[in-house]
């Protein structure tokens, strides 16, 4: 039966399994990877709902900036294995730092060097 579930449903089942014991914190590793935008948005809404309804702290590791901005109260931006920036999504978006701006604008060749 699990093989007949859609990717989005498998993610939802994984979330249900993760919260069944009412943890105080859940670590999500690329929770929207491989999902179409509509399903990814529903997973992000579910994560936000769990944060609000159950007071669960969520640590989300993602390369998907839309998802990061959708679910985050705080963002830590890592560069070369270190926290390069930490703040709110708005503070990240408004940052004038060239490395961050290049990343947000998709000019990844700067941060890959």
What are these regions (language model features)?
Residues 1-5:
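Conserved ABC ATPase signature
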Residues 15:
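Hydrophobic anchor residue at the start of the ABC signature
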Residues 22:
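Conserved catalytic motifs of ABC-family nucleotide-binding domains
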Residues 26-29:
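Catalytic Walker B motif of ABC-type/P-loop ATPase nucleotide-binding domains
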Residues 41-53:
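Helical segment within the ABC ATPase nucleotide-binding domain
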Residues 86-87:
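ABC ATPase "signature
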């Amino acid at each position: 039966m699990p093989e007949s579930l859609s990717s989005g449903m498998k993610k939802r089942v994984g979330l249900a399994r993760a919260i069944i014991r009412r943890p105080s914190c859940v670590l999500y590793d690329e929770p929207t990877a491989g999902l179409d935008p509509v399903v990814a948005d529903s997973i992000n809404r579910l994560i936000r709902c769990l944060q609000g309804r159950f007071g669960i702290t969520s640590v989300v590791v993602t390369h998907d900036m839309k998802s990061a901005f959708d679910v985050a109260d705080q963002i830590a931006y890592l560069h070369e294995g270190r926290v390069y920036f930490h703040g709110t999504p708005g503070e990240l978006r408004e940052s004038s730092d060239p490395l961050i701006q290049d990343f947000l604008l998709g000019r990844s060749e700067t941060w890959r060097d």
